[in-house]
């Protein structure tokens, strides 16, 4: 049985709260000032959390905005699942910090760069190298601790 939209939104809010509680230090290791420039990592991290917490595999979506789309210029990444747009780094553009909606105002208006399911086996090396240290810093702040993503 699929989770409800409200359950997906609650999990996204939990994860964003954990990112905020972990503070800026984990992101500084990646030369990122969250949320600016963190959308790709944040989407991948949230995708793995949603898989473990709710059993859903969301798609990572990356698009380029050739023009200004509501403050978004250049590249942005977020998740999509079952018709939902899920974004936990929109505040870098002046949007809400957590967006979970079936009617996105800005998402989907750019040019598709890439789209793929999160947490794919062939991405494991990249994920642990790029997202592993962030996951380790964020995990203690999650209401449902997840010990193993393997």
Where in this protein do the model-derived segments appear?
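A structural boundary/capping signal
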Residues: 1-150
């Amino acid at each position: 049985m699929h989770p409800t939209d409200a359950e997906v939104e609650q999990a996204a809010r939990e994860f964003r709260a954990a990112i905020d509680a972990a503070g800026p230090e984990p992101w500084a290791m990646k030369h990122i000032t969250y949320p600016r420039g963190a959308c790709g990592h944040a989407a991948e991290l949230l995708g793995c959390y949603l898989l473990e917490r709710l059993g859903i595999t969301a798609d990572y979506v990356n698009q380029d905005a050739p023009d200004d789309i509501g403050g978004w210029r250049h590249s942005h990444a977020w998740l999509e699942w079952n018709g939902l747009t899920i974004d936990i780094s929109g505040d870098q553009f002046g949007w809400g910090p957590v967006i979970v909606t079936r009617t996105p105002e800005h998402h989907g208006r750019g040019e598709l760069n890439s789209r793929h399911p999160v947490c794919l086996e062939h991405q494991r090396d990249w994920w642990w190298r790029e997202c592993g240290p962030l996951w380790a810093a964020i995990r203690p702040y999650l209401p449902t601790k997840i010990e193993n993503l393997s």
